[in-house]
């Protein structure tokens, strides 16, 4: 059976651990993580939650809890039954330059 799933909400992790570790000093940059993927349907199917705005956290259902790429702010997708969710959205990259 084909199932549908909701789309992830807007990003909520405004300042990730990676951001905290790299956002000081001249010419520094950091990745602002966002929300995780939407929760998939409880029944098996092909639907998968999309990552929230800004990427960020993990999917909220079972096998969909795949983390995004390290240090990029990318988020995991929501699961759908026994299927893995799709990849989350991209993170927001902020770079500061000395003037």
Where are these regions (language model features)?
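Low-complexity, glycine/proline-biased repetitive segments and flexible coils/loops
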Residues: 1-99
């Amino acid at each position: 059976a084909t199932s549908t799933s909701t789309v992830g909400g807007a990003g909520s992790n405004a300042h990730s651990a990676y951001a905290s570790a790299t956002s000081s000093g001249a010419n520094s940059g950091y990745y602002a993580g966002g929300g995780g993927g939407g929760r998939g349907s409880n029944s098996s199917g092909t639907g998968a939650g999309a990552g929230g705005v800004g990427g960020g956290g993990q999917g909220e259902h079972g096998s969909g809890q795949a983390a995004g790429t390290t240090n990029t702010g990318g988020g995991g997708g929501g699961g759908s039954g026994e299927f893995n969710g799709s990849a989350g959205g991209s993170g927001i990259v902020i770079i500061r330059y000395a003037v």
